[in-house]
């Protein structure tokens, strides 16, 4: 894992340009993507301080045939597009902290993943559900802090 300072330098210096071209295709947006990643890392540092982190990209998608896997019994044809959400993520013991864009921070204790009526239909409940599902299926979960932007 690299530090946020090292990660930012990789993007600002152009060392990650080949990766950015591979993900986003459009050469004309290279400067924009470099700055976008640097800004996301800076925001992560403002929220959580400097330290080791990783970067993840979740591509957007477009449905070509079918829509919503839950309505189609998993039978849809989708394609990824070169728009995405990126997350800057660092490890944290026992707690999950997530900030998405300008939304307030969500904080979840890994010791409290039970369903709560007052949390239903919230982003917090979705995150808790994924974590609980991983744990219930034998997966190992750990705490993290993340800043996400799209």
Regions from the PLM with identified roles:
Residues 2-150:
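ATP-binding N-lobe of GHMP and related small-molecule kinases
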